[in-house]
Amino acid sequence: EYLLFDQTFNTGDNKLPAPRTCELLTSVAMHVEGNGDELMTRWQAFRPHYLKTDQYFDTTVRAGMAALKILEERRLAQPMGLRGNGKRNPYITDAWRSGETLKTIEATVDGLNQFFLPGLTTALEGKQEKHLAERIRNQFKEVQQNFPYAYHPMATALDEEDQFRVLQGLYVDISQLTILVNDQAAVALNVVRGFNSSDGD
């Protein structure tokens, strides 16, 4: 992202298509591709074992819960100034140089909707929690309806009040989804979340 989108770098002598920068970018891309292939290979080998473990269900649900909490707190609340010193700060978001922060948030929501939601709602329905399962489905739809209106760069969304209101709407929808999943669904499924489970420590 730095090589492609950093404004200061891309006004200097080493900006693309400078040969050394092209070489470095090619090496980085090949390294990322190699890591991705290696992760996929190892996951495919580990997957059958993982699916058979006693912890599979709880671990998977907690992973989805953690993703939602990180999305709500670190990727939205903190840069919006809703936590900490109360100042808006686009530079603590992912992909801020490229202006694609909110598209990465949409990708996270889409991934959870595609790969996490079906299993979660099936489990809830198995516990006679069909109403809760439907509420969660509907809330995912509410979150997704914020896009593409929320495609602005985070710096713009934080600086312009009309765009900030769009961002606030997205935050509220994600917060409501987090409550439904992390509080109500977790209780219904007897999934215990550890203290500070999304802190990464």
Predicted regions, residues:
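Mature extracytoplasmic or organellar-lumen-exposed domains after removal of signal/transit peptides
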Residues: 1-201
